[in-house]
């Protein structure tokens, strides 16, 4: 397609967000999850309520939270006020100190009470290999799914060894693995493993927490060529590779900007240029050692 040069207006989107298919209860069954969602990491409860309300107004229909974020109640209030419960895909997570079968069941009930609505996707936040029990925790997720309390289950921050251990113990791979992934940390080997085993890849910190990535000359040159922002280029790069992304912001203009990524398509040349930015720079904790 012809590469645009005009600046994209930041307007409320009406185009439906593409979805990915998550494995549900049985092999061959799947549920649809929006490919672009809204994250609320490091956002307090009151600010999360306002940010989610704005995100819903803009057009987001997927929200990602967690018990440890301390903002499930604010997210729930925003969803209830918007009256979009049936239309929004909701994800939350069990924290490391709630690992174990019974503890996870109790943690799920507490999260659901704080959110005030059904949870679509429940994730193990970290494998916590030194202190946690991700196998027992995942068995609890399987029970919640079998009972119809949650539609799909998955994990976050699992490396290949963790995924193989989990599969050996419970007989299945998770539907999704939410991991740190951005142009400087592309996790190519893990992504290949995901593709081989039908695991959806979801990127947290998809923009690399801002900073160097959004000022990188490769990214800014592409942004200038397309008449969009650096953040929009990076989000588009993720989406064109089939990933789920959950950018975070509390600024209304940025919330809208991050959603306005469906009016252009990066060329293969641009995609290849971004692929060359991978330098193995991890910004968050190492899943092999992090225990929370």
Language-model segments: residues:
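Glycine/small-residue-rich loop that forms an oxyanion/phosphate-binding "nest" at active or ligand-binding sites
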Residues: 97-139
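N-terminal binding-site loop/beta-alpha segment at the start of enzyme catalytic domains
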Residues: 1-88, 140, 289-291
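Beta/alpha (TIM)-barrel catalytic core signal, keyed to glycine-rich beta->alpha loops juxtaposed to Asp/Glu
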Residues: 127-292
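Short, acidic/polar
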Residues: 44-56, 100-114, 163-164, 185-186
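A short, structured active-site edge motif that brings together acidic residues
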Residues: 86-99, 120-127, 157, 181
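A structural motif
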Residues: 60, 116-119, 150, 174
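Acidic (Asp/Glu)-rich catalytic clusters
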Residues: 28, 76-87, 108-117, 145, ...
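Active-site mouth loops of central-metabolism enzymes
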Residues: 36-46, 93-101, 127
């Amino acid at each position: 397609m012809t590469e645009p040069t005009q600046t994209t207006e930041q307007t409320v989107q009406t185009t439906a967000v593409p979805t990915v298919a998550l494995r549900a209860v049985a092999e061959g069954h799947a549920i649809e999850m929006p490919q672009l969602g809204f994250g609320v990491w490091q956002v307090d409860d009151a600010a999360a309520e306002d940010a989610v309300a704005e995100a819903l107004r803009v057009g987001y229909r997927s929200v990602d939270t967690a018990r440890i974020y301390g903002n499930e109640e604010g997210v729930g209030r925003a969803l209830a006020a918007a009256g979009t419960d049936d239309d929004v895909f909701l994800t939350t997570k069990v924290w490391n100190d709630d690992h174990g079968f019974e503890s996870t069941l109790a943690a799920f009930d507490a999260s659901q009470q704080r959110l005030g609505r059904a949870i679509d996707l429940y994730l193990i936040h970290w494998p916590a290999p030194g202190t946690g029990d991700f196998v027992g925790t995942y068995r609890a997720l399987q029970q919640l799914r079998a009972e119809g309390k949650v539609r799909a289950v998955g994990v976050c921050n699992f490396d290949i060894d963790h995924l193989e251990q989990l599969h050996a113990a419970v007989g299945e791979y998770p539907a999704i693995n939410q991991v740190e992934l951005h142009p400087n940390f592309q996790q190519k080997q893990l992504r290949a493993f995901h593709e081989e085993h039908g695991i959806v890849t979801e990127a947290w910190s998809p923009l690399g927490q801002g900073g160097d990535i959004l000022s990188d000359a490769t990214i800014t040159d592409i942004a200038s060529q397309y008449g969009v922002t650096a953040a929009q280029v990076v989000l588009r790069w993720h989406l064109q590779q089939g990933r789920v992304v959950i950018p975070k912001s509390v600024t209304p203009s940025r919330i809208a900007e991050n959603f306005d990524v469906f009016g252009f398509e990066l060329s293969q040349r641009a995609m290849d240029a971004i692929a060359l930015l991978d330098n193995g720079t991890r910004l968050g904790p190492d899943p092999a050692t992090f225990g929370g």
